[in-house]
């Protein structure tokens, strides 16, 4: 279960498989924000080896390329299937998409519940941790960020 499911991205060739399936299409005048989410995921906390689970939301503004929409959940799944910290996973998803898609702007928002917070230590049931990563114009433009969050609230 651990090797084949929960930690599947440690398998030799897992990143190569992801790269081969990362299909790009010419944007051809499509330069408005694209959002995908909520994308459900489960991962294992690198500190406590307890699960955390939640959803990821991705928004990007294409430059030259659009990505096949099913590829974004594949990217989330790939990075969730490693021993993780939510902050690192959020950054890894953003870095991968930025490096392979080269968008004008990119936002990744991850929301998760951590069993290490619910079952031990502070024992806070139901707390949601939110992390974000911004790239390109999303970092410098409040309008881009507002559009992303507005699209999420629909």
Give each language-model segment a name.
Residues 1-154:
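A domain-level signal for the structural core that forms small-molecule/cofactor-binding pockets
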């Amino acid at each position: 279960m651990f090797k084949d499911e929960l930690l599947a991205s440690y398998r030799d060739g897992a990143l190569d498989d992801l790269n081969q399936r990362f299909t790009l299409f010419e944007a051809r005048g499509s330069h408005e924000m694209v959002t995908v989410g909520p994308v459900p995921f489960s991962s294992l906390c690198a500190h406590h080896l307890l699960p955390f689970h939640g959803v990821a939301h991705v928004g990007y503004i294409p430059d030259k390329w659009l990505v096949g929409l099913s590829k974004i959940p594949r990217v989330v799944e790939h990075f969730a299937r490693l021993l993780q910290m939510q902050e690192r996973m959020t950054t890894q998803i953003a870095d991968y998409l930025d490096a392979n898609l080269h968008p004008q702007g990119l936002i990744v928002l991850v929301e998760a519940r951590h069993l290490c917070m619910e079952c031990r230590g502070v024992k806070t049931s139901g707390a949601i941790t939110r992390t974000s990563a911004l790239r390109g114009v999303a970092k410098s433009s409040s309008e881009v960020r507002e559009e992303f969050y507005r699209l999420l609230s629909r």
